[in-house]
Design a protein with these regions (language model features):
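Conserved S-adenosyl-L-methionine
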Residues: 4-6, 13-14, 91-92, 115, ...
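Glycine-rich adenosyl-nucleotide cofactor-binding module
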Residues: 36-60, 311-349, 366
Length: 377
């Protein structure tokens, strides 16, 4: 497997092992209304401090137990105006690089610094992840290639699951120099991809609209399927006579009927073939809504109509912070909710080590309230 090399890699490749264990000290807790209260024994945690040390501190209790990890790390676009300092020139990062990387750190490019920062954190996140768990990482084009490369190395190329494309803008940016960048990526890796199974997404009203019942079939709504397929089938070549008398000599060139002639006649006898209103169409097997799965397999293209856009996220943050905007690139609540719907169970442990405005925690609490679950963050 090809690996990515950068200045400082040799110094950080095993740095996660050198990070000291810190004891997490419980300072205070909040009740369900967000008010400060006495310790209520909640297992949810918001940890304040260096996330590298925080991740190491979680290992004794949570190694191999976290079902779903979502992180939104710095995109490394050169923006210095936010809490994580997007071009990785934060004084704390500089100090850390000097201590860990040494003099080489003085010659690091922006990308070198970002990789040095991310690598040990990903190593610890991999240890925390459950065998049947998955990590979702938001990123854009600036570091997508580098992130995919080091994730291949940390999690194993065989554990790559998907690259989700989130369309984050609902209108083009007229100030764009070349193209209006309307999407971000969400990179998905499993601890063991063969053991990870996503939850299916609820069927939407739009998807269900494809099911109709033009012949008033007592079995209810259905949609037509294509009888022909390109996969070779030894029994998939035969002529068909329509109710109108039209003869179809066989499937289209380069394709085969999906079922044998015997099976086709069984389906037709059971009223599961649609010939069109005049009985002259190429036959189409019916797929009944009552017989399909309750949900659909998650897709890799997420539209802003489904999961929100950047303006939604900013409105949500302003409503929390009395009109202030302390975070430049928040993620909408519905985006995080979609990830948790796919990747968590009702009693899962969920981790976000670049927590920002706390949208992940918000989503966990709301989902628990909605379905009576016991997810923890």
């Amino acid at each position: 497997m090809p690996t990515l090399e950068w200045i400082g890699k040799s110094k950080v490749i095993s740095h996660h092992q050198d990070v000291p264990f810190r004891v997490l000290e419980r300072k205070y807790s909040f009740d369900e209304n967000g008010q400060h209260s006495e310790d209520n024994g909640s297992e949810n945690m918001i940890i304040r401090g260096d996330n590298l040390e925080a991740l190491k501190a979680l290992l004794p209790r949570y190694e191999g137990r976290v079902k779903c990890i979502y992180i939104d790390p710095p995109y490394n676009t050169g923006n210095e105006g936010w809490v994580y300092n997007d071009n990785v020139n934060d004084p704390k990062i500089k100090k850390w690089l000097g201590a860990v990387v040494g003099k080489e750190g003085e010659d690091l490019t922006r990308h070198d610094k970002w990789l040095c920062m991310m690598y040990p954190r990903l190593k610890l996140l991999q240890k925390l992840l459950a065998d049947d768990g998955a990590i979702f990482i938001s990123i854009d084009d600036a570091e997508f290639f580098n992130l995919r490369s080091i994730c291949n190395e940390v999690f194993g190329e065989q554990n790559f699951i998907a690259t989700v494309i989130w369309r984050k803008n609902y209108a083009p940016k007229s100030t764009a120099k070349h193209f209006s960048e309307d999407h971000d990526y969400i990179l998905v890796f499993g601890k063991n991809a063969d053991m990870w199974t996503p939850h299916k997404m609820p069927r939407t009203e739009k998807q269900n609209k494809a099911y109709k019942n033009p012949d008033n079939d007592p079995r209810g709504l259905w949609r037509p399927n294509n009888l022909a397929a390109r996969n070779y089938y030894s029994k998939g070549t035969y002529s068909i006579t329509c109710p109108s008398g039209r003869v179809i000599n066989g499937p289209p060139s380069g394709s085969y009927w999906r079922v044998s002639e015997e099976k086709f006649h069984e389906l037709d006898k059971d009223g599961r073939i649609w010939w069109g209103k005049d009985g002259n169409n190429v036959p189409a097997p019916k797929i009944f809504l009552t017989e399909v799965s309750d949900g659909i397999v998650p897709q890799t293209l997420w539209s802003y109509e489904e999961v929100g856009h950047t303006q939604d996220a900013k409105k949500e943050i302003k409503s929390i912070f009395s009109g202030e905007m302390p975070f430049d690139t928040p993620k909408p609540y519905r985006l995080i909710e979609r990830i948790l719907q796919i990747a968590s169970d009702s009693d899962s442990i969920i981790l976000d080590s670049f927590a920002g405005s706390g949208t992940t925690a918000h989503a966990v609490l709301n989902m628990n309230k909605a379905d009576g679950g016991h997810r923890k963050f």
